[in-house]
Amino acid sequence: MKLIIGVITLFPQMFDALKSGVIGRALKQDRLTLSFWNPRDYATDPHRTVDDRPYGGGPGMVMKFEPLALALKAAKAQLGENTKVIHLTPQGKLLTQAIVREKIHASPLILLAGRYEGIDERLIEAEVDEEWSIGDYILSGGELPAMVLIDAMTRLLPGVLGHKDSASQDSFTAGLLDYPHYTRPEKIADRPVPSVLLSGDHEAISRWRLKQSLGRTWQRRQDLIKRRSLSENEQRLLDEFFEESS
């Protein structure tokens, strides 16, 4: 068995750390192949811009659709058009050893490592097959989670270790998953930015974001909702989310 993984990242040099230890051994044995695509190489403006301000306001920047889409296109041209794309994000399903054991047989895989406040939601809708999280905490980007996943999968390759060493992590904190992010352009194909984010009504934007966070958490991490004592307003927003999604 050989593991083939492509990574979309603004910082491919971070992955030099994988040349040591178990993963380094797998690379030398040709049991693991890693390839990298930097979205900045696919930016079309003179400044090689990969991020922009978020619609609806708020802190930070959001990674733009086009450079990521072009990087993914290049990755799929090399690895195969049907290669699954995995986005590493706190909004994803919790990565477990069972998932690692399952996905090692899904190689090749493309891992998408975001930065800043997140990735334009329309890129996720159009290109991402699954979203995974390594835990309920925030990191500066998706590179470390991608390395965690690569490490966990590589350890299961026959012959890389003297034996298969499984581990589990069950330390969580209560909270809600993030709401969707959008940045320019205002419309991509048939996917427009939600109109409320263009309204300039900050109260309505805050309400929409909380509703999306509650709904997304219920859909993906009900355990977090069950730990949380919802206020009357939060319960009302969650009910609205169900009605709008039905």
Curated annotation (Swiss-Prot):
Keywords: Cytoplasm, Methyltransferase, S-adenosyl-L-methionine, Transferase, tRNA processing. PANTHER family: TRNA (GUANINE-N(1)-)-METHYLTRANSFERASE. S-adenosyl-L-methionine binds at residues 114, 134-139. This is tRNA (guanine-N(1)-)-methyltransferase. GO terms for biological process: tRNA N1-guanine methylation. It comes from Coxiella burnetii (strain Dugway 5J108-111). GO terms for molecular function: tRNA (guanine(37)-N1)-methyltransferase activity. InterPro entries: Alpha/beta_knot_MTases (IPR029028), tRNA_m1G_MeTrfase_C_sf (IPR023148), tRNA_m1G_MeTrfase_TrmD (IPR002649), tRNA_m1G_MTases_N (IPR029026), tRNA_MeTrfase_TRMD/TRM10 (IPR016009). CDD domains: TrmD-like. Gene3D superfamilies: 3.40.1280.10, tRNA(m1g37)methyltransferase, domain 2. Homodimer. Specifically methylates guanosine-37 in various tRNAs. It holds the Pfam family tRNA_m1G_MT. Its main location: cytoplasm. One of its GO terms (cellular component) is cytosol. Its EC number is 2.1.1.228. It catalyses: guanosine(37) in tRNA + S-adenosyl-L-methionine = N(1)-methylguanosine(37) in tRNA + S-adenosyl-L-homocysteine + H(+). Coiled coil: none annotated. It is found in: Cytoplasm. Belongs to the RNA methyltransferase TrmD family. NCBIfam families: PRK00026.1, trmD.
